[in-house]
Amino acid sequence: MSFAADLAKFPSATSVTVNSEGGAVTTNLQQGLAKLWCNWAGSATVNDSFNTASITDNGTGNFSVNTTNALANVNYCRAGFAVNTAGTSGVLLDSTTTITQTDSTTVISIEVNYLNDGAVDGNRDEVIVHGDLA
């Protein structure tokens, strides 16, 4: 079988296992891939994204990231970062402080806070989500 024939199998595979550098362990590649990422301006204007249908601006520093393809459940892991309007890094994307929205498989709630200054609309907000797709 040719290398091209082997590569052709990947799109239909339900699992891709990769050996570690030393070969002692394996990892499931699909489990390690980001299922969503988005880079947007504080006005909810999407600069670039993957699996992001849109951003909803719910108020200062409060956003809903709307997915293109649903996640399997709400037990996903999100991480994010932002730059505040003064250009200072260190803004935290958070989902546990004052947001009233509830996470779902199609909406990821994000709040942008800058240290002790409260909610802000960052100049550049970024989020990445790991989990299972539906």
Each language-model region and where it sits:
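Extracellular receptor-binding modules and their adjoining Ser/Thr/Gly/Asp/Asn-rich linkers
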Residues: 2-4, 9-72, 114-134
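A detector of low-complexity, intrinsically disordered, Ser/Thr/Gly/Pro/Ala-rich segments
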Residues: 12-15, 24-25, 83, 95-98, ...
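Extracellular/virion structural assembly segments
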Residues: 70, 84-85
